[in-house]
Amino acid sequence: MQYYTAPMEGLTDRIWRQAHQRWFGAPGAPARYYAPFLSPPENRVLIKKKMAELDPAANPGAPVIPQLLAKDGALAAWMVTELRRLGYTEVNLNFGCPSGTVTAKGKGSGMLRDPAKLEAFLDEFFSRTEGPVSVKTRLGVTRPEEFDAILDIYNRYPICELTIHPRVMRQLYRGEADRAAFAACLPRCRMPVCYNGDITTPAQLAALEAEHPSLSGIMVGRGLIADPALLRQAVGGAPASKEELRGYLDELYHGYTALFGASSCAVSRMKAHWHYLIYRFEGAEPLEKQLRKTREGWEYEVVVNQIFTLPLK
């Protein structure tokens, strides 16, 4: 069983990957970091700023898997060629993102609206590229039963691994992941399958492994942002200490300040991390409200110093 980190836009960028690997990485935990999605440019001219996220020199440690968000199979295949020139072997296709700004363009889980278009995309894509390609998907748009037809399509192609997030597009991240629907589809999958969705504790990881020992991997997202040591604990390591969390968060903050050129921009990114992480501190609710109101670096630093006077749960 392998453990992966989910691609989360605005959270699991190269600054985070470097800090997470340094502070909480353990052998095989994670085995792979999936980078947030990259949209291939229609003019086929790569944007240096966006490609910096995937500079191999900026991604040491565990392997990084680029993820593509596209609806044009030929364009996606071209992008795979460019990524392989950088040294990446596996590339992941995103048919799972439920964001309205993404699905309105027919991308992400919006690709699942029309199985015929999905099949046409995969036909075009696989006719133009070779090598390992994985897929991240949802069960459908409105009903889990839609996945029967979607899986029939996936099974026709040389997908090296299928990561299933058992929600439908319309749910976004509301409600619970449909574990029953996930279990029902497993016998029909002709490729290795990875589970993703609502894993927040080492006990949940262990229970999922026991229930589905044939899985190739488990991918964690929001649970790992809330508990950066989650995967380390899954392989027998220690929970995150307050000192580790402080060092990790300081590294993120300074890294984002250097990247964006202003602490105020870094504060915005850090608040996205604290949205999940603050609940690890006992009695932090009043400070959470203060943190949300911060705009400047000095304001952020004052509130964070106060948070770290609290005990961990």
Residue ranges, per PLM feature:
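Hydrophobic faces of well-ordered beta-strands that scaffold small-molecule active sites
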Residues: 3-6, 33-35, 64-68, 91-93, ...
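Alpha/beta catalytic cores of nucleotide-metabolism and tRNA/nucleoside-modifying enzymes
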Residues: 3-4, 9, 15, 120, ...
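Glycine-rich, positively charged N-terminal anion/phosphate-binding segment
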Residues: 8-82
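Active-site beta-loop-alpha junctions enriched in small/polar residues
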Residues: 8-10, 38-40, 69-71, 96-98, ...
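Alpha/beta enzyme core
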Residues: 25-27, 78-91, 95-105, 116-191, ...
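Generic structural signal for helix capping and beta-alpha/helix-loop junctions
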Residues: 42, 100, 171-172, 203, ...
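Short glycine-enriched, charge-decorated loop/helix-capping segments at active-site entrances
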Residues: 106-112, 235-236
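Flexible, glycine- and charge-enriched loops at secondary-structure boundaries
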Residues: 111-115, 175, 242
